[in-house]
Design a protein with these regions (language model features):
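N-terminal carbohydrate-binding accessory modules
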Residues: 21-79, 208, 329-333
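Extracellular glycoside hydrolase catalytic/binding regions
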Residues: 29, 61, 133, 143-161, ...
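Acidic/histidine-rich helix-loop elements
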Residues: 41, 45-66, 89-93, 130-134, ...
């Protein structure tokens, strides 16, 4: 075969097969319809996910890699939450941190996992007072972070959710005051910035008491379309039996809006890292997963890490902890049915 014909043959073969950039999977855009998450094809999505630890921390320890995501996929996850601490964002710098996020988003895309980007602060954003130094931020920095995320990921369908602020709390007045109206205004301002910068990701809004309490939503919801709400109903937030209290505090929201429990989990009183409010046993796991299954609520388990608590595994061979054994089985069972 002449060289010119060989060249033409190779060119046609390349076009037929496609370049690597062309064959990377693009996930279906997720949007809000009523109280559900819907794909572009009209499929209802109820997510079962896992929390990564901070990508900055994982990269420093050599574990921010595709193998980490592959293991989450094996556990049955359909959603991965990236908790971005303000201190890590500042110390690494915007451009370098975006490179970390881009790698994670690319691995998630290849594996068919959707992503939540979470601004992982705890405290009172109105007063700019926080639970401890690692959560320190400002209103301006928070707005700028979301402008950056919106611009950067506006055309990326894998990044399905922006969790605007991890855990709002005034810590019983130790961090001053913040009314629901004041919090609502901050969240609505953030959503305006995100939307004006072209992002289609769904904003996730938490309530007070470390993101547990959504009772204010009943009479005074966030004034924005296409959003979802968040709760972190750890076991010690309420005494058993939990279910009726959950419904009164946050579960009622799922009748009208999509709801994502972006942190759930438990550990025994003598387990490594045991602390308030996560101490419990498998009865909590059974109750919270059953409640979510019954009510079509998405959840993300905290945390896929052997150091942060309550941890899901004990070592980098991914040996499950007590809660890890429970949730791995629950996620895999749900994945098998769906």
């Amino acid at each position: 075969m002449k060289a010119s014909k060989i060249g033409l043959f190779l060119l046609l073969l390349l076009v037929a097969v496609g370049s690597p950039a062309q064959i990377i999977t693009k996930l279906s855009q997720v949007r809000v319809q009523g109280n559900k998450f819907i794909t572009a094809e009209g499929k209802t999505m109820v997510f079962r996910g896992l929390n990564a630890s901070d990508p900055d921390r994982l990269e420093k320890s050599g574990h921010w890699d595709k193998a980490y995501f592959e293991e989450m996929k094996r556990w049955g996850a359909t959603l991965v939450r990236f908790p971005v601490h303000p201190t890590a964002w500042r110390s690494r710098g915007k451009d370098q941190y975006l490179q970390l996020l881009d790698k994670g988003v690319a691995w998630a895309t290849e594996l068919g996992l959707y992503v939540v980007i979470d601004w992982h602060s705890i405290g009172n954003l109105k007063n700019e007072m926080y639970q401890n130094g690692m959560y320190e931020t400002t209103q301006k920095e928070s707005f700028e972070f979301w402008r950056t995320m919106a611009e950067h990921y506006k055309d990326n369908t894998t990044v399905a959710f922006f969790e605007l602020f991890n855990e709002p709390t005034v810590m019983g007045g130790k961090l001053g005051t913040c009314s629901w109206d004041e919090w609502k205004k901050l969240m609505e301002e953030t959503i305006t910035i995100i939307r004006a910068n072209g992002a289609k990701a769904i904003p996730l809004v938490a309530g007070f008491n470390w993101a547990y309490d959504l009772r204010e939503v009943a009479q005074n919801p966030i004034k924005a379309e296409g959003i979802a709400y968040v709760s972190h109903p750890y076991p010690m937030k309420r005494e058993k039996p939990w279910e009726d209290k959950w419904t009164a505090d946050w579960g009622f929201v799922a009748k009208k809006y999509p709801l994502v429990l972006t942190e759930i989990g438990f550990c025994g009183p003598d387990d490594k890292g045991a602390h308030v409010p996560v101490i419990s046993d498998e009865s909590y796991g059974e109750a919270i997963t059953r409640y979510c299954d019954t009510n079509g609520i998405s959840y993300v388990v905290w945390v896929f890490d052997p150091q942060w608590a309550p941890m899901l595994f004990t070592d980098w061979s991914y040996t499950p902890t007590r809660q890890g054994r429970y949730f791995k089985k629950a996620l895999q069972a749900y994945s098998a049915k769906n």
